[in-house]
Amino acid sequence: MDVHTRWKAARPGALLLSSPLLLFLLLLWAPPSSRAAQPADLLEMLDFHNLPSGVTKTTGFCATRRSSSEPDVAYRVSKDAQLSMPTKQLYPESGFPEDFSILTTVKAKKGSQAFLVSIYNEQGIQQLGLELGRSPVFLYEDHTGKPGPEEYPLFPGINLSDGKWHRIALSVYKKNVTLILDCKKKITKFLSRSDHPIIDTNGIVMFGSRILDDEIFEGDIQQLLFVSDNRAAYDYCEHYSPDCDTAVPDTPQSQDPNPDEYYPEGEGETYYYEYPYYEDPEDPGKEPAPTQKPVEAARETTEVPEEQTQPLPEAPTVPETSDTADKEDSLGIGDYDYVPPDDYYTPPPYEDFGYGEGVENPDQPTNPDSGAEVPTSTTVTSNTSNPAPGEGKDDLGGEFTEETIKNLEENYYDPYFDPDSDSSVSPSEIGPGMPANQDTIFEGIGGPRGEKGQKGEPAIIEPGMLIEGPPGPEGPAGLPGPPGTTGPTGQMGDPGERGPPGRPGLPGADGLPGPPGTMLMLPFRFGGGGDAGSKGPMVSAQESQAQAILQQARLALRGPAGPMGLTGRPGPMGPPGSGGLKGEPGDMGPQGPRGVQGPPGPTGKPGRRGRAGSDGARGMPGQTGPKGDRGFDGLAGLPGEKGHRGDPGPSGPPGIPGDDGERGDDGEVGPRGLPGEPGPRGLLGPKGPPGPPGPPGVTGMDGQPGPKGNVGPQGEPGPPGQQGNPGAQGLPGPQGAIGPPGEKGPLGKPGLPGMPGADGPPGHPGKEGPPGEKGGQGPPGPQGPIGYPGPRGVKGADGIRGLKGTKGEKGEDGFPGFKGDMGIKGDRGEIGPPGPRGEDGPEGPKGRGGPNGDPGPLGPTGEKGKLGVPGLPGYPGRQGPKGSIGFPGFPGANGEKGGRGTPGKPGPRGQRGPTGPRGERGPRGITGKPGPKGNSGGDGPAGPPGERGPNGPQGPTGFPGPKGPPGPPGKDGLPGHPGQRGETGFQGKTGPPGPPGVVGPQGPTGETGPMGERGHPGPPGPPGEQGLPGAAGKEGTKGDPGPAGLPGKDGPPGLRGFPGDRGLPGPVGALGLKGSEGPPGPPGPAGSPGERGPAGAAGPIGIPGRPGPQGPPGPAGEKGLPGEKGPQGPAGRDGLQGPVGLPGPAGPVGPPGEDGDKGEIGEPGQKGSKGDKGEQGPPGPTGPQGPIGQPGPSGADGEPGPRGQQGLFGQKGDEGSRGFPGPPGPVGLQGLPGPPGEKGETGDVGQMGPPGPPGPRGPSGAPGADGPQGPPGGIGNPGAVGEKGEPGEAGDPGLPGEGGPLGPKGERGEKGEAGPSGAAGPPGPKGPPGDDGPKGSPGPVGFPGDPGPPGEPGPAGQDGPPGDKGDDGEPGQTGSPGPTGEPGPSGPPGKRGPPGPAGPEGRQGEKGAKGEAGLEGPPGKTGPIGPQGAPGKPGPDGLRGIPGPVGEQGLPGSPGPDGPPGPMGPPGLPGLKGDSGPKGEKGHPGLIGLIGPPGEQGEKGDRGLPGPQGSSGPKGDQGITGPSGPLGPPGPPGLPGPPGPKGAKGSSGPTGPKGEAGHPGLPGPPGPPGEVIQPLPIQASRTRRNIDASQLLDDGAGESYVDYADGMEEIFGSLNSLKLEIEQMKRPLGTQQNPARTCKDLQLCHPDFPDGEYWVDPNQGCSRDSFKVYCNFTAGGSTCVFPDKKSEGARITSWPKENPGSWFSEFKRGKLLSYVDAEGNPVGVVQMTFLRLLSASAHQNVTYNCYQSVAWQDAATGSYDKAIRFLGSNDEEMSYDNNPYIRALVDGCATKKGYQKTVLEIDTPKVEQVPIVDIMFNDFGEASQKFGFEVGPACFLG
């Protein structure tokens, strides 16, 4: 029985409660229950009462108690115990409390020093712990890291590991921690934590040890509680663990919930304590917790000796129990209110406990006779037997018996109940409870208190010193523990006896043939099971590793579930097997494959600490994570279609100052400046008079294309044009001819394991059958894919006139017409109802930037993006060895456009240029601010007199209205005069590459260049552009029909390759394993037809085969007969860009166009002849710092410079060991363009070069003369839909409609678009002056208007004060008809009117922008027969055919085509180094190669200057998953996982008697074809780490049902894979996939490896956390890690703002030193810990560069007072005075003379000191002193 948690005993004074009146008074006084400081019982949460491994029961603190015949129960914990739980279980609802108590009754093993409990956060950092032993330590570290390890509270002079029982209470309150030992000694220590400390509850609680700590708690423990109240510690010996001689503690007590569970005979009455209940005195009104059990109070206080009637010392209130307490609670509520001492003895009130009708409300006294009676009892003072259940309920002289009450909360207590007991009280009346019919209390007299012992001799102990005492005597045997949790299912029992025959089976399902199974034999020993339920042997790490490998192999070898087989004969029903004995809990098995996510299970008990599982399968997608780090920039994508204009984004933060913008519009004329300096050479003057005609010039460059001419006649097809821009992705082309084989490439690296291959290649084609008869016309097929555009057809005959079309879109503006006469003013129409929202128009031209909008709300966190495309090349890596000089690079691409230069001084004003041609209409500008008030205009010309309107009634004079909003912008004015020519700007930065220019003329073919050297294989290029259609091949012979393939996905078009030379035939390779399925091969050449064999006899009907894989497209068939005309197909997609046609004849000169947008900067023209030297331009602004370029090619030798001054002495470099000569490095990176060399002398005139490539497009030539009028062109193709035209001119006014009824008041509509201007109204009153507007841009030049007749001047209005804007009024009554009003504002668009008459045919419009996709049109007319469609999906299986006659043996077939290549074999062992071949002739320079892999470590170069501070690189892409590493050491148990998947099906029982035959199932499909068995054994090995299930299906495709031998090939391949993998585990290669533990390990396996960078994984396990280090095999196999860039050191300086004697991390520019691997990634703490564990010594050098500053010894005084101090990784300070392992290799700084350096070496066997993390410098601060330092790598030697 479990007593480690609670005590219960009858309390004096409880007799008072037997009075119903008093109970009623207490009920009256009951306040609402407040929340308890409920203790968290760690022993219960860790399942101690089920005795996990390493835990046994023993006698507790008290061997006897006066109130009990049984000893206390405790638990003995051995070193085998591994107990942990999630911290969340301690405090599931809230965080860890700031102030709390830890209470424990414990007897530690004598002389031990171990942590009793440790709490870790989510990162694995210990945040709380209690270490028992001499000088116990309370470890506490909050979320800020306070206090540090040196400030942990230490309690010296106390020995908790003396082999005796101790009651220890720790109270943590604010910044103090108090230890109360054995209820007597009290010590308070300062706890330097932050004001609001946080202990993370997302980690784990470990009992008895720490992670990676050898010391494990051993001893006995009775109680371990966490209480969220710091005051609980002071009451520990009163409320939680009372003295043994306490007969009746002042606490309620109760019997153990179910003593029979542990003592079947009913013996053993044990008290256990109910936790006290602390109440917050400041919060009396909290709601009761849902799990309170109000009934319990009345019972708990009823067992009282009759003679004791003193008042209650502490009255219990209604408890609040957590789930953990519920399991042992009966009806007790003996929890304590923690109240101030004044209130401490006041009896607290009670709530209405709900005894049926007995207590209806607090205001009425309870009738003892009604409802369930209140149980009462007195203590029996003589040893009488318990009365039978049910007796003595009303008799105070008998003993009270309580009844078992069913639990209302989902049978939570059911395991504790006696199901046979009576229940006289219904559960609804009382609530959950427990039997207490065995409480018999014997009151004894306490013995005299023993005398105080003599004071012991003081111990002379230093902190941390351990003195082991003799072991104490063996304690008495513990009580039997409670039953354990249900163990795992035992092993399958023995087969039962033969059962009766089973029933007839159900009809069998349609069976599918399963592929033959595989058989796998592996030479590993597994833990064999013993008898049923016995525990298997432990498995060693190597075996478990092999098991993990085997598990992988099993998973890989296991194919997908085979199809359901035919129904077998039913076996006989066996009797149930004999039940196996309950086994011990087995070791945790490997994690199974992830099942479907189940519903959340109930909170499970915490499991025992298990081994670290292997990595689980990929989980279900989690919730959207936070936005990830920015990935590398991807490769530039293909240009997308122009998107819709986005909404204005939120206003961003102010950017960094941008480059100078483009020149703005001309400002207003400034004041006249001072006379400027003479300007630079002016522009050319005006054009002079034409000179005499010169001789005919040479043929000029092609001019710009002239204006569009009329369509010419159909020309002959031109020669193929140059390569156009990439078109849209085309459809797959037809099968091309097979090119000749390329040269044999170099052997590639072994690839990664491939994905499962597709289905295998199709079988050999069958013999060609006789041609069938022509079939009947089939139904029209489905819409085929859109074919390629055919060749341009001959012009067809004119069609019949079509139907009248619908009204066309509004045409573009025509030429301005002549001004018409003024029309009659129409009546004002009513505003029509708002029309439906029209479709979005085409995207308008890009407007000028609007003002920045307000910032929008932040959007929701987006999902983390998918992995991007491979990024651009990464940041430069660590400087590699100097490579050989690379080939000269190609000229780089044009740089980006430079920032605009500062404005130059104004040049002299140029003469006015000729009037430019009219540009295209510009985009509509933004509405400007109102301009400044203009001067009073002159009288305008009088307009023509209008018709006289009817006289209106005289209206009252209105008040001046408020200032109206700015009116809609007027129509664009007529074009103004062209502006003056602007000043020439400075040369801008080179712009970004412009868009591809117009295709130029075909250049002459250049001479064939010399053959280049073979380059390295390039990376896969982007999808190539669409190649030109190949020439039609000769018509092939009719091929055999291929199997129907599945439609393939569109692949990206590849670059068109050049045919390579035919390679020599390679040597014949060894016979490979059966390869995985290769890609579909090209169709082989047609074989010569064999002789026709005699007809065979009909074979049996085959089962339908599996659908074959997609075959390659067959050769083109013969042209079929034209089909019937089909329905009109949907409109095809835009065709590909056609070849550029021949230029048509010049058309007539068109009218000048409107001003065009400013064009993009054109590509540079051809190199002009050398110009005169220009005058010195003004200096440009300093450009931004560019990246440091690679050295350019050597410039020409300069003139010798003047002799420089004497330089400072350089530092002496380290003397490195002589390395092996490295092999020549790969070709280096292409260098950045070097700085321009000095101008060379003019070279000799070269010979005439070959014709150059076509130059870029030249400047626009002069317009050619008008050509003769060409003949009219044919009707062109309809143009694409043009952009939406400008609004047309207003049409004639329509007839007035009939007046409609007055509609209801509509909602306020959205602001409509500006309507057309109304006719001029009478002049309004003069408005207030407007704000000054910006100066408008000059309008385009207008055409002169007709002069109008002079108008009459209007009357001048008076200025009225602006009124406020009024609210909208309600609509008034309909008034009498007013005078004719002004035209109203334009209403919303009306309904579409009927189509008007067809207008005259407009001019040919220019091609518009691409329109939006239209609706799907009606079916078109049947087009011509398209190309052959992709094969359809396979149809359903046909019916089984009738067996044909057996055929005769056919003649041998012709040899089949070559089979697909087999899979790549495993990498062979490294071959011997071959002799170097003779030096070949120097080849031509090759193309620039790819960035090569890093070369081997070169000799140490001279120290470079310190580089500038680099920015931190972006987070790298996730690496590929490495192979599974060996099993690591067991980690701490993780949080409880989700429910596991359903277990595997058990083995089958013995065969039963035959049942009745089932109905025959449907026939299965045909099996796969047979296959020839390869000879065994197979020599080759395979490199794939696991075999894909899909490949197993393919490989097994030829296996029959009976012959299982074919699967052996796969098994032997797997065994070879495993053999290779185990070989690599024994002898790791130091690669990322196969890392070694340390460099020493690597050297032992491969003593011939050179020094260099290798991958290590000190903690083994999964290799994904391996890291790259530098292995110094020359130094015996050291493993070296490097300081990161910021920790490598600091350049020499005087450090004026820092203080001597402070750590470098406290400097303003300082930091703690951190270390990275050879790739710059930080090395994990765990990996460094393992690396230290595997090392015997470590060393590290630090170089101190000084100027008159001491680093180590001061030679002047001979002292080391100013020596540098180091802080080791274990936070230990190291210097000359306390560490003999530091020595100075060079101590040049000792003399304090000039620039020197001191090299200090730390070579220590205390590997935990290295690497150093901080440095203290002590000698600087004077004006003449400077220092810097360099930190070397930290190297560990095993």
From Swiss-Prot:
Q: Which residues form the Fibrillar collagen NC1 domain?
A: 1609-1837
**Residue numbers carrying 4-hydroxyproline:** 570, 576, 621, 639, 648, 654, 657, 675, 678, 690, 696, 705, 717, 720, 726, 732, 750, 756, 762, 765, 771, 780, 789, 816, 834, 870, 873, 876, 888, 891, 903, 906, 930, 945, 1017, 1020, 1023, 1029, 1221, 1224, 1467, 1470
What are the 3-hydroxyproline sites (modified residues) in this protein?
Answer: 680, 686
Per the database record, which ranges form the Laminin G-like domain?
72-244
Could you tell me which Gene3D superfamilies the record lists for this protein?
Answer: 2.60.120.1000, 2.60.120.200
The chain residues annotated with the modification Sulfotyrosine are 234, 236, 240, 262-263, 1601, 1604
Against Pfam families, the record matches this protein to: COLFI, Collagen, Laminin_G_2
Q: In which tissues is it expressed?
A: Widely expressed. Isoform 2 is more highly expressed in liver, kidney and lung.
Q: Which family does it belong to?
A: Belongs to the fibrillar collagen family.
**Function recorded in the entry:** Type V collagen is a member of group I collagen (fibrillar forming collagen). It is a minor connective tissue component of nearly ubiquitous distribution. Type V collagen binds to DNA, heparan sulfate, thrombospondin, heparin, and insulin. Transcriptionally activated by CEBPZ, which recognizes a CCAAT-like motif, CAAAT in the COL5A1 promoter.
Q: What is this protein called?
A: Collagen alpha-1(V) chain
Taxonomic classification, please?
A: Eukaryota, Metazoa, Chordata, Craniata, Vertebrata
